[in-house]
Amino acid sequence: MPSFDTVCEANFVEVKNAVENTAKEIGTRFDFKGTSAAVELKDKEITLFGDADFQLQQVEDILRNKLTKRNVDVRFLDVQKPQKIGGDKLKQVVKVKNGIDSEQAKKIQRLIKDSKLKLQAAIQEDKVRVTGAKRDDLQAAMALIRKDIADLPLTFDNFRD
């Protein structure tokens, strides 16, 4: 039976490159000279540092710009609130989403069940596998998922016939 997997995975090589390019631009920009503005990547978290809110916002804008240029969807970013660290410095954590959380997976599963297509959706850890008898039904399900779940950068892979 034909099937496909619905996943939500960022290309971490491109994320790393975008963070490195952001750090390079921060180092060369005149308005960041003599400030503590910086950006770091650890595991699946990007940490932004700055002296004030507007600096953090500028660093975040640079990061979003670099990610967009590298074809990484900015919907992968989960921006946290800025935190004060020693003195007048600020830190902001930006988490990179990876995988579909159980709430979103259940939403996708419910969407497919309510669509009246002859398909089954199974939640498998951080992805949703959709199985059906006809390839046309699977393509209709892909279109339906893309249309109704716009807040997640979903991709479809592992298409089996």
Curated annotation (Swiss-Prot):
Keyword Nucleotide-binding in record: yes
UniProt KW Nucleotide-binding keyword: yes
Stored SUPFAM superfamilies: YajQ-like
Annotated transmembrane regions: none
Gene Ontology CC terms, in alphabetical order: cytosol
CDD domains, alphabetized: YajQ_like (cd11740)
Disulphide bridges, residue numbers: none
Pfam families for the chain: DUF520
Keywords attached to this entry: Nucleotide-binding
MF terms (GO), sorted A to Z: nucleotide binding
Gene3D superfamilies: 3.30.70.860, YajQ-like, domain 2 (3.30.70.990)
Family: Belongs to the YajQ family.
Protein role: Nucleotide-binding protein.
Name the UniProt record assigns to this protein: Nucleotide-binding protein Dtpsy_2240
